[in-house]
Amino acid sequence: MDIEKYNMLQRNYTKKNKKLNLVSLLIISIIELISIIILIMKKSSIELIITTTIIELIVLLLVLVIIKITLFSNDKKEIYELYLKIKEELVLKVLKKHFTNITYNQSKGLTESFIRKEGLMSTGDIYSSNDSISGIYKNIKFCQSDINIEEEKEEKDDEGNVTTYYETVFRGRWLVFDFNKEFKSNLIVESGAFPNLVYGQEYMDIEIEDVEFNNSFNIYAQNEHEAFYILTPSFIEKLKKIDKKIQSAGIRFLFNNNKLHIGINNSDDAFEFDELKEINEQEIEANMENDIRLIMDLIDELDLTNDLFKK
């Protein structure tokens, strides 16, 4: 692994950047000082001196940005390419400790068409997904990806001017597991904080006897009988335990085509580390272990290996 090379590149980049900043600050200060002295000698007005100084400062800063881009573009490209290579090696290293039949693609994820086709959630106006992982844990097949969804919003001020901006409505992980019961109809169980509530008329809003669960979750079912077949009292307790353990902004359990989908809206990207810092391999591996632990915990806590009800 090229961690030593990566850290050396980061150190060199930081030194060059600091040196350029200091030199630039000195040059800008000298130029501005000379300009002010010349304007004072010409007996220019205070307004002209201030305006000229501001314009010169903006121009000089723009020149500095251009110089930085020109000088450091190759360095940043080399660092980023090495970052991607090391990240893939670290992720695969940790995955292989726990799973079999592993595939990992950091640039691809669950496609927008898949999310739409399966009716998992609204994909908003801007959709992206990466860090696709699939594998087997205790004979249970799974896959997961990071997903980011943004929706276009408009804001009107008092004068009627409209400003368009994009708001992140989902940023987190989407996981898919083989489920240990067979069913024909879809079922959605989600915490009240989960966004993207887009359902057709075929869903009905139902409640169960567990008041605490009803207060924390919304349940939408296509078939009430199948919903209660899946949501046994013991399974409900497992869902409550998972929800408390994850503590995200929202969580969705979606039962679809004999699969269990779990969306976790926690404003986080799994398996990432700061590309602007030197790599601490042990620390990064520990963080990745935590990200991977979630997959194992969900399979274990929800008892997905129990195939008693499989037909």
Which sequence ranges carry the predicted segments?
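Canonical alpha-helical transmembrane segments of integral membrane proteins
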Residues: 21-41, 56-60
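Cytosolic juxtamembrane N-terminal segments of multi-pass membrane proteins
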Residues: 1-20
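Juxtamembrane membrane-interface segments of multi-pass membrane proteins
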Residues: 1-7, 80-98
